[in-house]
């Protein structure tokens, strides 16, 4: 506990959902996902996607894009402490709820990493690969769940990232 940075990356690995913080826990995000009203008409509304966005870079980039009157396909966005905190249960809840895709939008990782918690986006990418294998076994196209990277100052790219994801679905 003394070395905990409160990033939540342990959430994504915990199958029992017992790890929590006072103001952030697995069930809280799961409840947000389950309470979203998903449009019924795919043909009329287009693909229904959920965006789980890192609150450090991606979520502020989404907000800045909106403040600058950028436009993109409608969607629902939910902030997460770090993409490393994304639990497969959240993706499962979203797909069960009727979302056509889940976009994981976070900080850059790899050699040019910008993750505030260093490995969060990288950990999420590994978990996304496991989710893709599970979706494939269930007969669901694994590309319905994708992870994309954005820096806080790349808000002008956000509409293209979202529209590109929607087009792939």
Predicted feature locations:
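Disulfide-bonded cysteines in secreted/extracellular proteins and peptides
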Residues: 4-10, 14, 54, 82, ...
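C-terminal functional segments of enzyme domains
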Residues: 150-169
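A short, flexible N-terminal coil/short beta segment enriched in small residues
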Residues: 24-56
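Conserved acidic residues
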Residues: 49, 75, 100
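Cofactor-cradling patches in redox/metallo enzymes
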Residues: 78-156
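Short helix-loop-beta junction
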Residues: 66-78
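Short, charged/polar "capping" segments at the starts of alpha-helices
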Residues: 57-62
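Iron-sulfur cluster-binding cysteine motifs and their immediate structural context
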Residues: 1-32
